[in-house]
Amino acid sequence: MLNVMDKFCWLYEKPTCQGQIKALPEHFIVKENLGFEFAGKGEHFMVKIRKVGENTKYVVNELAKACGVKSRDVSWAGLKDRHAVTEQWISVHLPGKADPDLTDFVAEHPGIEVLETTRHDKKLRPGDLVGNWFQIRLLDLTNPEELALKLEQVKMHGVPNYFGQQRFGHGGNNVIKARSWGNDEFRLRDKSKRSFYLSAARSWLFNMVLSTRIEQGSVNSLMVGDCLQNAGEDNCFLAESITEELQASIDKGLVNITAPLVGDNALPTAADAEAFELAIIANEPSLLKLICDNRMRHERRTLLLKPQEMEWQFDGNDVVLSFALPAGCFATSVVRELLVEQEGSTHANIDQ
């Protein structure tokens, strides 16, 4: 299978170690972190589930039937892959109704467990989560010694905050379609496809900017006019000049350099950084036209991603790796820096 991610640079050089990911669902475990407590009362029935072999939307539809409501009355914070063991909360709008008995629901769906239920005064919405915790078993490693060194590098310095291959579709089809749409080769009314192609377009441009900074050795080095964020904050500020103090803050991870999620408004960068980003974006005029035609607004995303709570344990030629990532970040971008996947490996939809 064509891996469009091969177009983008590795931070620590392309690994020589090969291995397999997710031969079985239990080799890939994902646990959602909402980051807030429930009220314990309210119109919304909250259900924590563990699922294997089922995707989130299927579970939502089946849970709606069990609760006697429409699927539109059931919501979630993030979609989780079917080819994994995943835990997440789902909310069901049940105003004035008692908590339903889910015994039959569980009995009829052997791939779904109900771990916990409670009540809340608000429904879950897509994006209502802090992040996800992952446990991944990487199997049949051909060079465990190299992988051990790369694990230390990743824990210390992080990985490129790339959007993963699943964002771009099989063989990059979502990007190909986005270019054609931007060139007015077809009209598109399907809301789901519009969202896929627009997300792919912005993600592709971000990855191109990030990859070029790695290639030129500037992923950790300030440019005049860079748009920066303090660690853990969303607000940006401009690097009007390069100072030793500011560069030291970047080296320590206290300040992050960002790259664009392109919109129809002007880039917030200036001087060298603005010229650098504009030159790369100009290479994809059809994607830029598509984004502007759809009036998407500019956002920023950090260049580097540092996994939290990162631990690992070798087991022969396998390694069990665990870490936490913020919402919107890809576990596959971490794994990509560690090994080259063997044929037969599968990807999880883990971007939410």
Curated annotation (Swiss-Prot):
Enzyme class: isomerase
EC number, UniProt record: 5.4.99.27
GO cellular component: cytosol
Matching Gene3D superfamilies: TruD, catalytic domain (3.30.2350.20), TruD, insertion domain (3.30.2340.10)
A GO BP annotation: tRNA pseudouridine synthesis
GO molecular function: RNA binding; tRNA pseudouridine(13) synthase activity
Active site residues of this protein: 81 (nucleophile)
Reactions catalysed according to its record: uridine(13) in tRNA = pseudouridine(13) in tRNA
Residue span(s) of domain TRUD: 158-306
Keywords tagged on the record: Isomerase, tRNA processing
Xref: SUPFAM superfamilies: Pseudouridine synthase
UniProt-listed NCBIfam families: PRK00984.1-4 (NF002155), tRNA_TruD_broad (TIGR00094)
Entry similarity comment: Belongs to the pseudouridine synthase TruD family.
Function: Responsible for synthesis of pseudouridine from uracil-13 in transfer RNAs.
Name this protein carries in UniProt: tRNA pseudouridine synthase D
